[in-house]
Amino acid sequence: MGRPQRGDTAKERRERQDKVTSPPESGPISQSGLSDTVDWTSETNENMWLAYDFDERKDINQARGQDIHRDQELFDVVLQNNMSDDQFASTSASVSDDWYDTGFDQAFLQPSSTSTTAYSVEPSPFISIEPPTLTKETKKRNSQSSDSSKPSSTSSQSLIERVTSLNLDLHQQSIIAGQIVDEFGNIDPDMIDPLHKDNRLSFAVDSMTQGLQNFHSLLLEIINTANGTTFSSESASPHVNRPPIQQQQSPSRFLAPPSRSCVPSLFCFREGNSSQQQSKNNATGIDLPTSLMIISCHIHLIRLCRHVFAGIRAALSSKDQHQQALLVLSSCQVGGVSISHDSDLKLLILIQVVARLINKIGVLLGYPCSPADLSNSAVGNLGNATEDERKKMLLPQLLRFVLAQEGVAGQSSHGDGMEGLREEIRKLNEVLATS
């Protein structure tokens, strides 16, 4: 039997497809029929794969066309939506994955994660402020200025604390000395027992002399710190731009100069061309609170001296108790020297020492006259001061007010200041002269 024609093959293919789709008839199947069925099935399957392959390719191409058309529509929609936003026009779809925040004010675009090489971050638009690079000379100059300013501020603070402490101590000592004078004033002189254990006159004398020396030493140190001058025992003239005397040195190193012309006054820093004078002498000046504290110390010190001399005069008022009172005072030391052989001589030396120290303190405070000229009855006058001496005063009006209250400038006073001290010393000299 020959090979079938192409037309018959198509016809047979349709018939065979109909047979395959129709259910087989029930009944016994013979061996020959089974073999025929297998042959038909294999041939049919071979032809069917060809048909299905063509149909599948057709369906796949159609699906691909639909997907391409759908993607084109989606791309058109996205493009239309993003045309109004230029920010995302040049970015890719992976921008959201590669965007990270490095701070509240900086944001950078990280390179692609597929790159394994090191990357450099773009510079921030914000300029970082860094300290300028200092040269060696600038660093050395800054270190020297800081080192020199720290000891100066520390020394000034220490001096202020010492002035405050001394002012409080002098105030308390003056109150105690005033109580001693009141006790002697309320008791008959013949009933006073200088040898009594409660007699505090000897301690009052010690506190007076020690207070004068401490105040004079501290006043010199304050002036030295303020204007950079130092007094030493080798020379009477001040040495400019030398470091101030250390605190551990004994007060005996502070020697007052013999004349007023070479003494830097406490009240000479804020008049006229004071800024030029300060820059010339490297002077820092003395502030107003420190100046007022110094004046307060001076007032309490003069009051203490007046009370002490009033107590000594009251103890020596009785002739019977005169020798006993001198025996009590004989234990006192004047300037570290004890004179036990002659008590009258000791009292005279005590008066001279107090007068001398008060004169030195007055000159350092800028008094244009000798406020403690206790040997003379005449009182100094501010009118005797020269024009240069007036310009040296820091607060002329305040100084005049203080001197007027203390009875220095020939004005009336309540007998509680310098004039009262002069009166007490004059009366004590009379007692010593009649003894």
UniProtKB/Swiss-Prot annotation:
It is found in: Nucleus. Its main location: nucleus. Coiled coil: none annotated. Residues 1-40, 115-158, 231-257 are annotated as: Disordered. GO terms for cellular component: nucleus. Residues 143-158 have a biased composition (Low complexity). Residues 28-40 have a biased composition (Polar residues). The keyword Transcription applies. Residues 1-19 have a biased composition (Basic and acidic residues). Keywords: Nucleus, Transcription, Transcription regulation, Virulence. Transcription factor; part of the gene cluster that mediates the biosynthesis of GKK1032, fungal natural products containing a macrocyclic para-cyclophane connected to a decahydrofluorene ring system that show potent antitumor activities. This is Transcription factor gkaF. It comes from Penicillium citrinum. The gene is gkaF.
